[in-house]
UniProtKB/Swiss-Prot annotation:
The name this protein goes by in its record: Gag polyprotein
One GO location term (cellular component): viral nucleocapsid
Function: Matrix protein p17 targets Gag and Gag-Pol polyproteins to the plasma membrane via a multipartite membrane binding signal, that includes its myristoylated N-terminus. Also mediates nuclear localization of the preintegration complex. Implicated in the release from host cell mediated by Vpu.
ZnF endpoints (CCHC-type): 398-415, 419-436
Source organism of this protein record: Simian immunodeficiency virus agm.vervet (isolate AGM155) (SIV-agm.ver)
Polar residues compositional bias, start-end: 122-144
Length: 520
């Protein structure tokens, strides 16, 4: 990638990529940090083109510098990046982010501004009696003191723009309440009403907020009734529910109640609490899914499930103890079976980091492939595949022919190969040399050419049938027929050898004696 997609030219980009993120660190700035900063600028109502010039970077620093001490990590990272860009535009050599921050504080006089924000211009610190200082210690927002009077400072368009974009993107999600708390810090009821009036859409949600405001205002009037009789001249009246809501009070009266009244009534903070209650009702309406319904899918990564779970916990209108109990009991209970087995093996009360580390990769395609490979390996090693459709009794585990142990075959046997006879099963000789099972002719089984007879070992076996009575031989029809054929054959041989003299059919020509005469 080149410098065409960044806020710097090629020479400035080379210098930018030599600056380290931390002192003595290995990581350095890259072009992806500039792209990330351009996307982050929209959240603060700033245009990304401001990063391309020195004046634009100074304007960004003026906006972000008041928020930097109490800002989030993303906001601090953006502020540090803009300070580095300002040094690059000013062609000042810096090695890391810390040096850039020190140079920016000096050139932009941020140290002097921080001191003047706490100390009045006269150089002498006044006492808090008489209402000369704001409750937060700063006199820049939402009002400034000029002489003995307080002057209202309206909200900046950037703040209103950030609020509108947050509502449009989140649609009254769980993030809206902390976003409103951050943007309305120290505001007067007039400023808060201005934040609500700039919302063109979501009028249904705003109507819910107005109903909550009316209920809280009525409750305030009941608990804080106005004093009977006329007020003394010059004394400020006590605020009512409509005064706190900003409908029957002016901006100057609101400032006097907050800063100069005796006793003081922070109408801005009270009205802010009412708005937060209404926004919490809107969040519950726009997020009807309860934390009890959040369950991990069979193929959902555990990290995504945790994000959805804590988002639902954030939207729940419950105390901290109840949310803690929900987290401890439901997070593991509603996980899928694969993650649940792993989480239960971690013991009692595992941390979220331990759970995320243990379930990393569970449910993904790689994890499924790994489990399938292990299952196939176990099936192959045990040889439990049923042939013939699974009919009959299951086969026993395989037995090794080499060592005689169960659980593996001969090709998987770890012991050295032994010479063993296939007939008798004894080691030391082959089947062709086996003398264990031979017949009475001296031949064993499977020796091909000679007739197969019963083994010699079975000739002397006792018969299982009882002996015939009187030691007589049992009748055998086959044996009887064989004897008849033998006798008949003997008679025919005798007749051919000695022909009868009185037989007229006998012809000597049929005999071989006629061929040789008396020589035979």
């Amino acid at each position: 990638m080149g410098a065409a997609t960044s806020a710097l030219n090629r020479r400035q980009l080379d210098e930018f990529e030599h600056i380290r993120l931390r002192p003595n660190g290995k990581k350095k700035y890259q072009i992806k940090h500039l792209i990330w900063a351009g996307k982050k600028m929209d959240r603060f109502g700033l245009h990304e083109k401001l990063l391309e010039t020195e004046e634009g970077c100074k304007k960004i620093i003026e906006v972000l510098s008041p928020l930097e001490p109490t800002g989030s990590e993303g906001m601090k990272s953006l502020y540090n990046l803009v300070c580095v860009l300002l040094c690059v535009h000013q062609e000042k050599k810096v090695k890391d982010t810390e040096e850039a921050l020190a140079i920016v504080r000096q050139c932009c006089h941020l140290v002097d501004k921080e001191k003047t924000a706490v100390t009045p211009p006269g150089g002498q610190q006044k006492n808090n009696t008489g209402g000369t200082a704001t409750p937060g210690g700063s006199q820049n927002f939402p009002a400034q003191q000029q002489g003995n009077a307080w002057v209202h400072v309206p909200l900046s368009p950037r703040t209103l723009n950030a609020w509108v974009k947050a509502v449009e993107e989140k649609k009254f999600g769980a993030e809206i309440v902390p976003m409103f708390q951050a943007l309305s810090e120290g505001c007067t009821p007039y400023d808060i009403n201005q934040m609500l009036n700039v919302l063109g859409d979501h009028q249904g949600a705003l109507q819910i907020v107005k109903e909550i405001i009316n209920e809280e205002a009525a409750q305030w009037d009941v608990t804080h009734p106005p004093p009977a009789g006329p007020l003394p001249a010059g004394q400020l009246r006590d605020p009512g529910g409509s005064d706190i809501a900003g409908t029957t009070s002016t901006v100057q009266e609101q400032l006097e109640w907050i800063y100069t009244a005796n006793p003081r009534v922070d109408v801005g903070a009270i009205y802010r609490r009412w708005i937060i209650l209404g926004l919490q009702k809107c969040v519950k309406m726009y997020n009807p899914v309860s934390v009890l319904d959040i369950r991990q899918g069979p193929k959902e990564p555990f990290k995504d499930y945790v994000d959805r779970f804590y988002k639902a916990i954030r939207a729940e209108q419950a105390s901290g103890e109840v949310k803690q109990w929900m987290t401890e009991s439901l997070l593991i209970q509603n996980a899928n079976p694969d993650c649940k087995v792993i989480l239960k093996g971690l013991g009692m009360h595992p941390t979220l980091e331990e759970m995320l580390t243990a379930c990393q990769g569970v449910g993904g395609p790689s994890y499924k492939a790994k489990v399938m490979a292990e299952m196939m390996q176990n099936l192959q090693s045990q040889n439990m595949v049923q042939q013939g459709g699974g009919r009959g009794r299951p086969r026993p585990p395989p037995k090794c022919y080499n060592c005689g142990k169960f659980g593996h075959m001969q090709r998987q046997c770890p012991e050295p190969r032994k010479i063993k006879c296939l007939k008798c099963g004894k080691p030391g000789h082959l089947a062709k040399d086996c003398r264990g099972q031979v017949n009475f002719l001296g031949y064993g089984r499977w020796m091909g050419t000679k007739p197969r007879n019963f083994p010699a070992a079975t000739l002397g076996a006792e018969p299982s049938a009882p002996p015939p009575p009187n030691n007589s031989t049992p009748y055998d029809p086959a044996k009887k027929l064989l004897q008849q054929y033998a006798e008949k054959g003997k008679q025919m041989r005798n007749q051919n050898r000695n022909p009868p003299a009185n037989n007229p059919d006998w012809n000597e020509g049929y005999s071989l004696n006629s061929l040789f005469g008396e020589d035979q």
